[in-house]
Amino acid sequence: PDGQTLAYCAFRSVATGADIYTISVNGGEERRLTTAEGLDDGPEYSPDGKHIWFNSVRTGLMQVWRMNADGSEQTQMTFDETRNAWFPHVSPDGKQVIYITYHVGDLEPGQHLANYNVELWLMPAAGGQPKRVAELFGGQGTINTNSWAPDSRHVAFISYRLNEKK
């Protein structure tokens, strides 16, 4: 958000899995922010630059997490035992987060999904009870690309249906 630092996910070893890193846009040394076993993925800065939202499988299911931009205070934000939660996107006003879920058992928690029924959920950025806003068909490369309108009142997303051969 400051135009100077990038947050990204990288797989550096089989032992540690994928973690979240930051690096200056001018290059230099990357900084590893997460060290949990398994997949930490989908980092996104909050509009004020104070937090990075991401998804992690560190509790056994993929859930939404938030940390300070320096990697401290990694806090689980979703606690759904029946769904895996992915790809949090913070509203421009910083008040809401939208993310996707898919049901436990559809895939392994760390697998990227495609061609599944998924749900779009909305929750307060400060934490609290999420609410389901849509059930869609999609997955990786589609509704994980949801985007907030500048006024934080609407969300655009992609959904699709597979053509069936007749």
For each feature predicted by the language model, list its residue ranges.
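Sequence signature of WD/YWTD-type beta-propeller architectures
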Residues: 1-166
